[in-house]
Amino acid sequence: MDVYEFYWRDQIKGYQLIGGLPERRKNPARVTQESVINLAKELIGDHVDANDIFFIKITKDENTGKILRPDPVYRPLKEYLRDRRRCPRMYMDLPLEYRVGYGSYARGGIVVDASETGFLIYSPDGIPVGTELKIAVLFPKEYELEMLEVSAEIIRKTFVAKEEKGYQYGLKFTQILEEDCRKLRELLQGSSQI
């Protein structure tokens, strides 16, 4: 089992262990810079700077907990937190309309973020993972509203509690026309990266 151990670099004592976390892809909770810094503040105090936090990757035996392979190099925290996706996600917050299959009625939702390969959307409706959706996203372009249409499959579903309860869905595009792909790229260029 791979584990990341986080260390705080003390000018006098050297590297001091803060704690360990499982590999990111196996960890359902999002590890953020703030969460690691808050953990460090609990243990060390308020004088913690993100530039003084480092991590190493170690391999542990799952049964005994014995360290099998420690990584000898301490790497900066920002390297652990960098986005490793092939296509980076961009924050959107745009209205969308979707249909489940061809004959169903339209339902509403919000695009939370997007990349060239998919969307993260919010919807109050419960839809099973694996469902194919036909999606139309509305966005402003100069003084008009444009529409971007894609087909996508739900690959992840998470319950969220906002003002009204609902779900976040991770969607992977299954079909997108070249014109809509161009619109998406333009939209992504004007958005801020997560």
Regions found by a protein language model. Name each.
Residues 1-28:
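N-terminal acidic leader/helix
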Residues 113, 154-156, 175:
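A residue-level detector for short acidic-glycine micro-motifs
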Residues 141-149:
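Short, Lys/Arg- and Gly-enriched loop/turn segments at beta-strand edges
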Residues 42-44, 127, 165-186:
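Short solvent-exposed strand/turn elements
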Residues 101, 116, 157-163:
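Short, conserved beta-turn/loop elements at beta-strand boundaries and strand-helix junctions
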Residues 94-134, 168-170:
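Short strand-loop-strand
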Residues 65-66, 70-114, 185-194:
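N-terminal helix initiation/capping motif
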Residues 37-79:
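Short, mixed-charge low-complexity intrinsically disordered segments
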